[in-house]
Every structure is written in structure tokens, then in C-alpha cells.
Curated annotation (Swiss-Prot):
It comes from Ixodes scapularis. One of its GO terms (cellular component) is glutamyl-tRNA(Gln) amidotransferase complex. InterPro entries: Amidase, Amidase_dom, AS_sf, GatA. Allows the formation of correctly charged Gln-tRNA(Gln) through the transamidation of misacylated Glu-tRNA(Gln) in the mitochondria. The reaction takes place in the presence of glutamine and ATP through an activated gamma-phospho-Glu-tRNA(Gln). Its EC number is 6.3.5.7. It comes from the Eukaryota. One of its GO terms (molecular function) is ATP binding. Subunit of the heterotrimeric GatCAB amidotransferase (AdT) complex, composed of A, B and C subunits. The active site is at K76 (charge relay system), S158 (charge relay system), S182 (acyl-ester intermediate). It is found in: Mitochondrion. Belongs to the amidase family. GatA subfamily. This is Glutamyl-tRNA(Gln) amidotransferase subunit A, mitochondrial. It is an enzyme of class 6 (ligase). The lineage of its organism: Eukaryota, Metazoa, Ecdysozoa, Arthropoda, Chelicerata.
Length: 505
């Protein structure tokens, strides 16, 4: 049952082949059995069971709320939920219980979805491996590399827990967040669909901010159809989020054809994304899929996004500057971790932030404060804003030329062993993990990561489709056609259930 898609599960509810209560219990058991992967920070069995019983009553009376009623969902631990611990994977918020619920979570619950718990993540979303959480790293379910303590594969990040929850069947969908690729990256690593909607299509209210101008709620799902259902359920204008907009009906009421046609669809392949560090397997996949799209009737051509080559540096400056501003609130006084050293206000600030925030977070705060110094403001922050505009303009020009979608890699390699990952510094990780994903966030565009094939080592490889703003319908239609063409193998849940050697790592 855990291998069913959302649409298949709802069909089972309609036919009374199973009930939301049964499915909820099965998911909770799977979460507990898979605890060695460390996908969840907080599990909510009692609350989930209550929601499942209420859903069962609605199905029994013939009055389900919609296509998500009774469907188990996981939520990344940077979305607020009333009275539910929300940590952002950080010691700073280890005991933070929000007084309100994020709008996207409210909308899912309003559709009858059953929230199972909160998923693990890189601390405050600042990472690409899901290895930097205060609650320990999340492990990739696709392959156990060996018996050494650090010889396992990373999930990608920062929404690694959500990706693992979906890949293992612990949940039928999940919320992530995407600031520079944090939904698409782990989706790619874990063999699930990862959707980054257009900036503003989903409310950010209740999403604890990292970089306000780029953060968006993301969606992780088993298939493109499921991602479309979750998108339609969550897209809305929200008076609590001034950056949200009323998305077109094609986004809010998205319906995909059974077998979408690609005939005549113009797809661009950005030449700048063929960059140093790309492994041959990803390059071969990219070329092969472009050829297969052409065989399906698409018009595939090379395009240029010349300023994307500066995206890593540009993103780094802007991200650090916004982090420095946003994280001034974590001072140990109003909420969050409070150190015992209260000899002075300055000492309390310093000790609370040192104890509560990891080295990566503290490093970005320091860098952001440096970039924002009066002597450096024009040289770094203003210049980065100008480059961001150039990156965005490149996309605008390509789409104005008649190109409808772009096809790019998501990451430059398959998932790395943790032992390899730890050898790279944070800057090197970003250049490999986020080069192909960050430009989309800076332009505010929609993108979707689609699993394509397994590497020679048996790890998922994915590609990304990118479209103009609010083109989710056309983009997901192409993604679904690609999904049907490639028939990516899902994780063998029975085999996964017996990978107990992970538990000793």
C-alpha cells in the first residue's frame, strides 16, 4: 500500500479497499521502522490518528473534502505548526513551539491531509546534504555504501528528510522549502519528484525565513501527478504574505492529461550548464534525454544564459546578506536557545548564538555583516543585486525568443558518500550541488526535478525542467510525459525494509 500514488490511494478510499486510519497506522509503523535513516525530527502519531479517524468518517459519509482527504503528508521542520515543536534542525530552536500554523500546512489540512510529523533538514536550510542538522544527518535509502561509520550516501539537502519520507513510503507527499535548490536537490538524490513553484504562487507565511527574496515552499512527491495535486491544494494569495499572488487558474486548478503531447514544444538546453565538475553519467543522461524529447516531437535547441556562470558567487553574497538581517532575531532573549552566561547583554548574545547556531550558520552571518558594511555595501551587495538582474534577464530573453521550457541537470554528480562529502568545504559543495538550481531562485521561476535513471552504482540521477513564471501547467505536463517515457524504477520498499545494517552506522 505504501507504494501507491496519491491518486491511487484516494481511489482505494473510494472503493473502500482501505481506510485513512489503516494507512496512517502503516505510515507511522514505517516511520518507526525506518528511524535509522533519521528522516523525522518529530512524529505526531496521536494527532495523525485523530485526523485519520475524522477523514475516515468523511469518506464513510460520502463527503470527502477533496483529492487529499486522508492522505498522509510530511512537513519540513521549518514550517510552523501550532503547538508542534519547530526546530529548523537547530539547537537554537530545539524547544520552539509556534503559536500559529503556516498557511501551506493549513491548506493541506483544510483538504483533509493527515500530517504525520516534521522532517529533518540542514540547520536553517543552509546546506545541500541534510548532514548539518543538530539532530543528526539523514541517510539516503537507495544504497548502503559499507560498514564504516561514515560510509553511507547523502540525501541532498536541505529538505533531505522530506525526500526520504516520500521515497520510503513513510508519507505520500511532503513539504520542503527551496531557496537555492533545497527541494530539487534531495528529490534528485532520492529518486522522487521535486517541485519549486513560481515565487509568490505559494504563501511563505509560517515558513521560517532564510532568504526572503528567494524562499519558496517546495513539494516532494512520488510522481508528477501527485505534485500537481499538492500544488493545486496549496497555491493561493495570502493576506499574511505580501509577496504572494493570486496564481492563474492553470496553477490553482491544475489538471494533467493522461499522456501529454510534446509535439512542437520548444525546449532549450543552456550551454553554460555544461560546466566543470559535471560527471560523465550526468552529461550522458542530459544528452540522451534531450534526444528522447526530440523523438517525442519537441523542438530541442541550444540556448545561452551567459550570466549563470556568476550565479554561485552572486547567490552567496545575497544569501549571506539576508541571513545576517534575518538572524539578528536569534539573540537568546525573546525566544530560542539562551546561554547561561548572562554577565552582560553582549556576553549573553554571543554565548547564545555560539551555542545555538552551527559553524555554517555563524559563518554566513559573519560574511553577510561584512558584505553590508558601509565600505563594502556597493562593492558586494549592490553589485550582487545587479548581477541577479542580469541572470533573471537572461531567462526572460530566452523565453521571449519562443523557447517554452529549459532542460538542465539538477546536480552535477550522483549522491556522494558521506566520507567524500565531508572532505569538501561549504563553498565547494555549493559549486557542485547548487550551480544548476540557484539561478532559478534568483529569477523567481518554476522548476521541477524529474528522476530519470539509476547510476552505475544504483543511485538516482535526475534532470530539471524550468519554465517562465506561472507556467507550472505546461512544465508539469512535459515532466509527466518525460516520466512516462523513462519509467524510473521506484525504491524497492521490501528490500529497503531489510537494510538493517544502516541502523548501526
Amino acid at each position: 500500500m505504501l507504494s501507491l500514488t496519491i491518486k491511487e490511494l484516494v481511489s482505494h478510499f473510494k472503493a473502500k479497499k482501505c481506510s485513512p486510519v489503516d494507512i496512517c497506522a502503516t505510515c507511522i509503523k514505517e516511520i518507526n521502522d525506518s528511524s535509522f535513516l533519521n528522516a523525522f525530527v518529530t512524529v505526531l502519531p496521536e494527532a495523525a490518528e485523530k485526523q485519520a479517524r475524522e477523514s475516515h468518517a468523511r469518506w464513510k459519509s460520502g463527503k470527502p473534502r477533496g483529492p487529499l482527504d486522508g492522505v498522509p503528508i510530511a512537513v519540513k521542520d521549518n514550517f510552523c505548526m501550532t503547538g508542534v515543536r519547530t526546530t529548523c534542525g537547530s539547537r537554537m530552536l530545539a524547544n520552539f513551539y509556534p503559536p500559529y500554523t503556516a498557511t501551506v500546512v493549513e491548506r493541506l489540512q483544510g483538504e483533509g491531509a493527515v500530517v504525520l510529523g516534521k522532517t529533518n533538514m540542514d540547520e536553517f536550510g543552509m546546506g545541500s546534504g541534510a548532514t548539518d542538522s543538530a539532530f543528526g544527518p539523514t541517510k539516503n535509502p537507495w544504497k548502503n555504501a559499507g560498514e564504516a561509520a561514515d560510509d553511507w550516501y547523502i540525501t541532498g539537502g536541505s529538505s533531505g528528510g522530506s525526500a526520504v519520507a516520500v521515497a520510503t513510503g513513510c508519507s505520500f507527499g511532503a513539504l520542503g522549502s527551496d531557496t537555492g535548490g533545497s527541494t530539487r536537490n534531495p528529490a534528485s538524490r532520492c529518486g522522487v519528484v521535486g517541485l519549486k513553484p513560481t515565487y509568490g504562487a505559494l504563501s511563505r507565511h509560517g515558513l521560517i525565513p532564510l532568504t526572503n527574496s528567494m524562499d519558496v515552499p517546495g513539494i516532494l512527491a512520488k510522481c508528477v501527478d501527485d505534485a500537481a495535486v499538492l500544488l493545486s491544494a496549496t497555491a493561493c494569495a495570502d493576506p499574511n504574505d505580501s509577496t504572494s499572488v493570486s496564481a492563474p487558474d492553470s496553477v490553482r486548478h491544475l489538471k494533467l492529461a493522461g499522456e501529454p503531447s510534446l509535439k512542437g514544444v520548444k525546449i532549450g538546453v543552456p550551454k553554460e550548464y555544461h560546466c566543470p565538475g559535471m560527471c560523465p553519467e550526468v552529461l550522458d543522461l542530459w544528452r540522451d534525454v534531450a534526444d528522447r524529447l526530440a523523438a517525442l516531437g519537441a523542438v530541442v535547441s541550444s540556448v545561452s544564459l551567459p550570466h549563470s556562470r556568476y550565479s554561485t558567487e552572486c547567490y552567496s553574497v545575497l544569501n549571506c546578506c539576508e541571513v545576517a538581517s534575518n538572524f539578528a532575531r536569534y539573540d537568546g532573549l525573546e525566544y530560542g536557545h539562551r546561554a547561561s552566561d548572562d554577565s552582560s547583554t553582549d556576553a549573553l548574545y554571543a554565548a547564545s548564538r555560539h551555542e545555538g547556531l552551527n559553524e555554517v550558520v555563524r559563518g554566513r552571518i559573519l560574511a553577510g555583516n561584512y558584505f553590508l558594511l558601509r565600505a563594502n555595501y556597493e562593492k558586494y551587495f549592490t553589485k550582487a543585486l545587479q548581477v541577479r538582474r542580469l541572470i533573471s534577464d537572461d531567462f526572460t530573453k530566452v523565453f521571449a525568443s519562443g523557447v517554452e521550457l529549459l532542460l538542465t541537470p539538477v546536480t552535477l554528480t550522483a549522491a556522494l558518500r558521506h566520507s567524500e562529502w565531508t572532505l569538501k568545504d561549504n563553498r565547494e559543495r555549493a559549486s557542485v550541488e547548487d550551480f544548476c538550481t540557484q539561478p532559478v531562485n534568483m529569477a523567481g521561476l518554476p522548476a521541477v526535478s524529474v528522476p530519470c535513471r539509476l547510476s552505475r552504482e544504483g543511485l538516482p540521477l535526475s534532470l530539471q525542467l524550468v519554465g517562465p513564471k506561472f507556467s507550472e501547467a505546461a512544465m508539469l505536463a512535459a515532466a509527466k510525459r518525460l516520466e512516462l517515457e523513462l519509467s524510473f524504477p521506484r525504491l524497492d520498499l521490501q528490500l529497503h525494509a531489510h537494510q538493517e545494517s544502516y541502523a548501526t552506522l
